C-alpha cells in the first residue's frame, strides 16, 4: 500500500483564494478548485462564467492577491465544451495561479477581461479567430490572424476546411 500523499505546499494558497472568491463574489463563483501537480503545483480554479468578470477585477485588486500580470490566455476545444485558460501572476510574491472558464460549445461566450488586463485584448481576439469563442464586451472583437472573409474557426475540432490544401 502506498503511503498517503503529502498535501501540496500551495494548498493553503488555493484554500485562501477559494475563500476570497466565495466571500467577495458569491458561493456560486467557484465551480471547481484543485492543485495542478503536473504544472509545479499551480493552484487552479474553475470560475463560473457568469461571475468571471467580477472575479477578474477582484483578483487584480484584492490586497492579498494582486494578480496584476496576465501571463497567458488560451482557448481549448474539448468537443463537449470550450474553455478559456488564464495564467495570472503576482509580481511581488512570484505566485502563479490558473483560472479556467467553461462555456457551451455551440454558443461559446465568455466575458472579456481586456478592461481588467489590457494584455488580454489580442489573446481574446486570437481565441475568437481560431476557436470561435466570443468575448462579450471586447472593444474590438475581430479576426487577428486570418482574413476577414475566412469561413469558420480552424482550431475547432469540428472544423471542416473549405480547401483541402489548407
Residue ranges and their predicted role:
Residues 1-166:
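Terminal low-complexity/charged segments
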